[in-house]
């Protein structure tokens, strides 16, 4: 244990003060553990997003987390709504609000919207300092389980391809694994090694999230057992040992009772925390106050340190679009 804690010689634990913008909550995937997707979808209007971003700026937020379901353009109703507003698709819509965000607020965009092609990633790189996609698990076996049997976008080959494409494009990237969706211990470890393999090739993975499944009412996996703190503890230690210099994050709103335990295990980031918006993926789990996180961290001798959505070592011309870099350096 001493060795794990010694790795974080700075004794800092970071977080990003963000605003969560759920651009659209329809998705082509129907995952067994998800409550974000809704057939009666809501597509946020441009003015609604601008209002949230403007307010977030007054709260001192520095990350704009743009999220929507995968391939929302497959939904004809979404497509029609976008067309009426003058947009060819969701990515053009996202690009415009991201560009507006950069020009009119102090927030920096970070997008997580499911599978994107190489060209789509390249397009969005112009207005995003970093991007993300959870690997969840590298095992194709899970595609035939209740977790992913109705989710074509959860094919690990597709997700690995996108993470690699982000590396080719030098996009600072956040990924992670999901614990407790029917995977074996070996599959968890293999997933971490797959992330390591990709990072060793491209060097772009800035953080890895070790996220625990949480049961929710009225989901197919409602009665599935949640992973124990011991299971999470093991995976955090292993992830830290395997991934070495990559930051390890555990969402604090999903782990209020065990967060300090996981800090001792080796995490060095609390992820995005918003003083304004809720976690729309886990709406039942409110964010802790930043002061609460500060106390959490201080009690174990760690200093809470705010960061941007892009990690400091990636804030260079090699990794960030010139316009965004100029904004960050101001």
Swiss-Prot record:
Gene Ontology MF annotations: 4 iron, 4 sulfur cluster binding; 7,8-didemethyl-8-hydroxy-5-deazariboflavin synthase activity; iron ion binding; transferase activity, transferring alkyl or aryl (other than methyl) groups
Positions of the Radical SAM core domain: 13-253
Cofactor: [4Fe-4S] cluster
Catalyzed reactions per annotation: 5-amino-5-(4-hydroxybenzyl)-6-(D-ribitylimino)-5,6-dihydrouracil + S-adenosyl-L-methionine = 7,8-didemethyl-8-hydroxy-5-deazariboflavin + 5'-deoxyadenosine + L-methionine + NH4(+) + H(+)
Chain ranges passing through the membrane: none
Pathway: Cofactor biosynthesis; coenzyme F0 biosynthesis
Keywords: 4Fe-4S, Iron, Iron-sulfur, Lyase, Metal-binding, S-adenosyl-L-methionine
Biological role stated in the UniProt entry: Catalyzes the radical-mediated synthesis of 7,8-didemethyl-8-hydroxy-5-deazariboflavin from 5-amino-5-(4-hydroxybenzyl)-6-(D-ribitylimino)-5,6-dihydrouracil.
The name this protein goes by in its record: 7,8-didemethyl-8-hydroxy-5-deazariboflavin synthase
Organism: Methanococcus maripaludis (strain DSM 14266 / JCM 13030 / NBRC 101832 / S2 / LL)
């Amino acid at each position: 244990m001493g060795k794990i804690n010694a790795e974080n010689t700075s004794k800092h634990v970071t977080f990003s003060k963000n605003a969560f913008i759920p651009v659209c909550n329809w998705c082509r995937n129907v995952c067994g553990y998800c409550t974000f997707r809704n057939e009666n979808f809501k597509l946020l209007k441009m003015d609604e997003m601008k209002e949230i971003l403007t307010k977030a700026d007054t709260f001192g937020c520095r990350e704009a987390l743009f999220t929507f379901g995968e391939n929302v353009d497959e939904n004809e109703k979404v497509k029609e709504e976008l067309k009426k507003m003058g947009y060819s698709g969701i990515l053009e819509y996202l690009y415009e609000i991201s560009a507006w965000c950069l020009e009119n607020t102090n927030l920096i965009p970070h997008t997580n919207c499911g599978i994107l092609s190489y060209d789509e990633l390249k397009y969005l790189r112009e207005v995003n300092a970093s991007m993300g996609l959870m690997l969840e698990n590298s095992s194709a076996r899970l595609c035939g389980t209740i977790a992913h049997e109705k989710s074509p976008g959860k094919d690990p080959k597709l997700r690995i391809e996108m993470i690699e494409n982000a590396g080719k494009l030098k996009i600072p990237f956040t990924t992670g694994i999901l614990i407790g969706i029917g995977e074996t211990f070996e599959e968890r470890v293999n997933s971490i090694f797959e992330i390591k393999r990709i990072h060793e090739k491209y060097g772009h993975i800035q953080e890895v999230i070790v996220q625990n499944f949480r049961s929710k009412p009225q989901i197919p996996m409602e009665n599935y057992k949640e992973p124990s703190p011991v299971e999470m503890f093991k995976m955090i230690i292993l992830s830290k040992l395997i991934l070495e210099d990559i930051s390890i994050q555990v969402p604090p709103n999903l782990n209020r009772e065990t967060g300090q335990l996981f800090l001792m295990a080796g995490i060095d980031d609390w992820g995005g925390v918003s003083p304004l918006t809720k976690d729309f993926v886990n709406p039942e789990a409110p964010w802790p106050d930043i002061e609460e996180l500060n106390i959490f961290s201080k009690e174990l001798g760690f200093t809470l340190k705010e960061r941007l959505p892009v990690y400091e070592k990636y804030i260079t011309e090699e990794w960030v679009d010139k316009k965004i870099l100029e904004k960050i350096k101001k």
